[in-house]
């Protein structure tokens, strides 16, 4: 009897061990059907967030690179808490205050990175306890875009959780997960996240495509729900419409919001590729930022598009998306755009260490074709005479499909530049009357009248705009004689299906051409 009991006990122990080993032996991504979409499932190993074990030898070498040492020095400096005198001088504790990454958020990144690369357990322990204490005591809410501050907490916490995983106590893992869920519930998108802004809006920024995705990957083994919610949204609604838009080699949210919106498309690309899922987007994504190469004027400014604040003393910079895209696609032209003003936001500095291609050589765009056409859903063309200080630049727009949000009603418009702006997009995003949904914004700046386009004035025409969003709503906007407001009372497009519908179809480029030489055309 004792032998039987011993045999049965040994058998079950053996089965348990085999099952346990099987659960922990899936080192690579697998793909599963989840409610009608096939999605990547994180490997059951750590690290899997931003880096994998195979990346660590290269990362250790990178730590000796002068540029990486410089970034690390910056992070170490940022890791020092503000002095009481510095805190007293702070006037605004909006999300930008937290994006400065002073104190614990920079400190724990360096500590977790140190453990990841060099194995210093004391650094891991410091990062785990400091970040947990921070997570348990933050509650920013949504006022003033503070969801972005909450997102930084998810991202930093996720790094510590994943990179220091084998140094965490089970009680700490549980506490981290509880904090992630609590913080996510306070964010603008909510938790579970609402799938209502898959093309444009704040949910097409940090919250979903970087912050919640990162936390979900880190905690997947213990709590798969967060990742599952995000990945289903992405593969069902975010990816298909982006891949369609990328085929036009351009972007719809303008020359300012590309820094936050398109950057987060690139973050999700990098995050899932590093996890092991491969490149998830249409490779045409590589050429989106080429539009900004062509928009660049000899004076350093760019021809504006969409919501932007034209300030002559500040040269527009696209360093973050250019760094992410150039490094992923090994694109020397985009590396050139990055090096124009290599200034990565502080909450993204760690990715300059992890992902930037330090060997990629920049190449000026002066051997690119002088005319560039962006096909459906855009129908846009930019033509240049050269790349030097005497360049003439002309832009022509059709707008086949209209997304809205930070996009303007500027179909059929043109801009001209020669030694100065000759025909321009007028107005400013944040003027004396305010910003989004201000009288200036909805009655002039975003409207056709502020652009070089045809107006047909009908005194009886109504421009219903209640769904435009933001504060200061009104039932109607001023009649400018311009283009209709797509969607239900100017509501931002919320799905791929809507984008292709009659409501959001605003034109069609019937033909285009330039030549006879494709690189240096006589006509465009």
Language model: regions and residue ranges:
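Bacterial Sec-dependent N-terminal signal peptides
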Residues: 1-24
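Terminal, non-catalytic domain-edge segments
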Residues: 24-37, 41-42, 47-49, 310-375, ...
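Residues that flank catalytic or metal-binding motifs in active/ligand-binding sites
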Residues: 45, 149, 153, 208, ...
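Aromatic-lined, polymer-binding surfaces characteristic
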Residues: 48-56, 60-296
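Non-catalytic carbohydrate-binding regions of carbohydrate-active enzymes
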Residues: 240-257, 280-310, 345-361, 374-376, ...
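Acidic/polar loop patches that form or flank catalytic/metal-binding clefts of enzymes
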Residues: 276-283, 300-306, 335-336, 391-395, ...
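CBM-like carbohydrate-recognition segments
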Residues: 292-327, 437, 441-444
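Catalytic and substrate-binding regions of extracellular carbohydrate-active enzymes
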Residues: 342-524
């Amino acid at each position: 009897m004792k032998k039987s009991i011993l045999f049965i006990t040994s058998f079950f122990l053996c089965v348990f061990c085999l099952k346990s080993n099987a659960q922990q032996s899936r080192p690579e991504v697998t793909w599963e059907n989840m409610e009608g979409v096939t999605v990547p499932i994180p490997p059951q190993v750590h690290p899997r967030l931003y880096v994998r074990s195979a990346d660590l030898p290269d990362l250790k070498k990178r730590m000796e690179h002068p540029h990486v040492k410089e970034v690390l020095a910056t992070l170490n400096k940022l890791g020092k808490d503000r002095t009481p005198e510095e805190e007293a001088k702070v006037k605004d504790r909006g999300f930008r205050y937290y994006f400065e990454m002073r104190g614990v958020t920079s400190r724990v990144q360096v500590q977790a990175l140190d453990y990841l690369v060099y194995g210093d357990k004391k650094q891991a322990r410091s990062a785990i306890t400091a970040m947990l204490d921070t997570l348990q005591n933050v509650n920013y809410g949504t006022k003033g875009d503070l969801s972005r501050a909450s997102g930084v907490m998810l991202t930093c916490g996720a790094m510590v959780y994943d990179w220091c995983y084998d140094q965490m106590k089970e009680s700490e893992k549980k506490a981290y997960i509880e904090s992630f869920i609590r913080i996510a519930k306070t964010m603008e998108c909510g938790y579970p996240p609402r799938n209502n802004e898959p093309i444009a809006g704040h949910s097409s920024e940090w919250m979903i495509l970087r912050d919640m995705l990162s936390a979900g990957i880190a905690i997947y083994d213990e709590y798969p729900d967060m990742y599952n919610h995000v990945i289903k949204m992405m593969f069902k609604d975010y990816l298909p419409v982006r891949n369609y838009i990328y085929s036009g080699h351009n972007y719809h949210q303008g020359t300012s919001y590309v820094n936050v919106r398109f950057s987060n498309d690139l973050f999700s690309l990098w995050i899932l590729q590093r996890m092991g899922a491969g490149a998830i987007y249409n490779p045409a994504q590589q050429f989106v930022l080429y539009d900004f190469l062509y928009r660049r004027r000899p004076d350093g400014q760019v021809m504006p598009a969409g919501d932007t604040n034209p300030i002559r003393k500040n040269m527009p910079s696209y360093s973050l998306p250019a760094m992410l895209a150039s490094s992923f696609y090994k694109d020397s032209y985009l590396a050139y755009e990055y090096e124009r003003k290599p200034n990565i936001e502080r909450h993204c500095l760690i990715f300059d260490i992890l992902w930037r291609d330090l060997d990629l050589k920049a190449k000026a765009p002066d051997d690119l074709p002088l005319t560039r056409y962006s096909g459906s859903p855009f129908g846009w063309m930019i033509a240049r005479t050269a790349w030097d200080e005497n360049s003439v630049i002309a832009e022509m727009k059709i707008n086949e499909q209209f997304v809205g949000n930070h996009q303007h009603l500027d179909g059929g418009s043109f801009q001209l530049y020669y030694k100065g702006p000759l025909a321009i997009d007028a107005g400013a995003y944040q003027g004396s009357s305010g910003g989004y949904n201000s009288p200036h914004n909805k009655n002039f700046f975003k409207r056709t009248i502020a652009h070089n386009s045809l107006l047909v004035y009908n005194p009886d025409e109504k421009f219903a705009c209640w769904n435009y969003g933001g504060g200061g709503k009104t039932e109607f906007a001023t009649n400018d004689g311009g283009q209709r407001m797509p969607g239900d009372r100017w509501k931002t497009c919320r799905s791929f299906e809507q984008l292709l519908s009659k409501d959001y179809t605003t034109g069609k480029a019937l033909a285009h051409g330039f030549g006879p030489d494709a690189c240096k055309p006589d006509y465009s």
